[in-house]
Structure formats: C-alpha cells, structure tokens
A protein has these predicted regions:
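Intrinsically disordered, low-complexity proline/glycine-rich segments
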Residues: 1-135
Length: 135
C-alpha cells in the first residue's frame, strides 16, 4: 500500500487501483466560471414601476486560470443582469478564503453577489466536477 501525502490542508489518501478520496470534494462548493449565472431577488431601478429578477451570466474572469475550459471566477469579477432597466451589472463579493486565484478569493456557487449596486444575490451555477473550499 502506498500513501500519497497531499499539500497541507488537503486530505487525500491514494491506494493502488483506487481513486483519490478528497475531503475538499465532499465539503466544497462548485467552482464559478465565466458564463455561470447569478440571481438576485426582485429589485427596481431605472423604472421603479417595473421590478425585475436580476439573473445573468458572469462576463469577466481570470485571464490565466480555467475551469472546464472557461475562465475561473474570483471576487470582484463582474457579470450582467439581462433584464434590468438601469445599471445591469453584478459583482462577485464573496469567495472562499482557502483558494486564491490571481491573489483574489475563488468565487463559487452559492457565494454572494451584488446586483446593480445594492441588491444581494448569489451564484446559481457552477462546475459539475470542480469544487473549492469548505461549504
């Protein structure tokens, strides 16, 4: 039997002929990527009589880190909320403190976003097979 000693903070054991059992996989959340959507509650700006549900994809990400061939999302990356009348951008405001991408926290499914400058939301999509941090 051989034991694989992973980097500190990652709990993995590899046995011959077996897949790696990774604690981060079981406890982490799906990694955010460019194109993954964020959603906020209904909010109105630009046209107060017409509140919109803020939903839209991320449009910026890491220039050199890719997840499933898509740019990885980090805190402060932005997306667009397609139905809003006024400023229609959202921004990633939360991420995992255990994974940094380009010196910024990795943004994951369920992490908080700020829509149109004030409305709170969260990332609702993520990678099917890459997870970061602890839930």
């Amino acid at each position: 039997m051989s034991i694989y000693l992973p980097p500190r903070g990652v709990h993995q054991v590899r046995l011959p002929g077996q897949r790696i059992a990774n604690e981060a996989w079981r406890t982490g959340r799906p990694a955010g990527r460019i194109g993954d959507r964020s959603q906020s509650g209904y909010h109105a700006h630009g046209c107060p009589s017409c509140p919109h549900l803020g939903v839209g994809p991320a449009v910026s990400g890491s220039p050199n880190v890719f997840i499933n061939n898509r740019e990885a999302l980090r805190v402060r990356d932005v997306g667009t909320a397609l139905a809003c009348c006024g400023t229609n951008l959202w921004r990633a405001v939360e991420g995992t403190s255990s994974v940094l991408i380009n010196d910024r926290q990795a943004h994951r499914k369920g992490d908080g976003t700020e829509h149109c400058g004030s409305a709170r939301g969260s990332l609702i999509d993520g990678s099917p097979d890459v997870r970061f941090g602890h839930a």
